[in-house]
Structure formats: C-alpha cells, structure tokens
Amino acid sequence: MSNYAIIKTGGKQVKVEEGSVIYVEKLNVEAGQTVTFDEVIFVGGETTKVGAPLVEGATVVGEVEKHGKQKKVVTFQYKPKKHSHRKQGHRQPYTKVVIKSVNA
C-alpha cells in the first residue's frame, strides 16, 4: 500500500499520493520547478499519522507542470420590468501539480 496524505493548499484540503496530478489555486512558482507543501493534516499507508492540527516533519513534494485558467463561469442578473441586467464572467486561475513524493 502506497503512502498518501491530505494537504492544505489554497484554503482547500486535497488527498494526494505519489504520481497523482492535482489542480490547486494558482501558486507563485514557475512551471518546471518543485514545490513543497508543509501543511500536511494526515498521512496514511502502512502507518497512520493524524495531525493536531498538522503532522510534524511531514512534507509533500511536487513539480509544477503548468498554469492555466478554468472554463468561464457566466453570471447573469436581471430585474424584471426594469430594463436592467448585468452579465459577468470569471475564469479562475489554477496550477497543475504532479506529486513526486510523500515524506512522513
């Protein structure tokens, strides 16, 4: 059984294991560089470690593959009988990360 971990990044919790690909909120790291996640909440596998609130000494190392934007989300608001409407679009930026190792 391979090691897996639950990390905190971008205000969200993500389950990761070696070789997995995750999409997280945009990180200020160039594509091709490595990124280390220090906020590890849980480590599982042959042994289990639960953080209170974080697991001491545990890190997750990944490599940034690319940056991009998600599909556009369109919001449309209108007021009936008032000839008033508003259309707004939003594309959330993300970072694609390939997990290289889970160190507990």
UniProtKB/Swiss-Prot annotation:
A single cellular component GO annotation: ribonucleoprotein complex
Gene Ontology BP annotations: translation
SUPFAM superfamilies, alphabetized: L21p-like (SSF141091)
UniProt cross-references to InterPro entries, sorted A to Z: bL21-like (IPR028909), bL21-like_sf (IPR036164), Ribosomal_bL21 (IPR001787)
GO molecular function: rRNA binding; structural constituent of ribosome
Record's keyword terms, sorted: Ribonucleoprotein, Ribosomal protein, RNA-binding, rRNA-binding
HAMAP family: Ribosomal_bL21
Assembly, per entry: Part of the 50S ribosomal subunit. Contacts protein L20.
Entry function: This protein binds to 23S rRNA in the presence of protein L20.
Protein family membership: Belongs to the bacterial ribosomal protein bL21 family.
Name this polypeptide is given: Large ribosomal subunit protein bL21
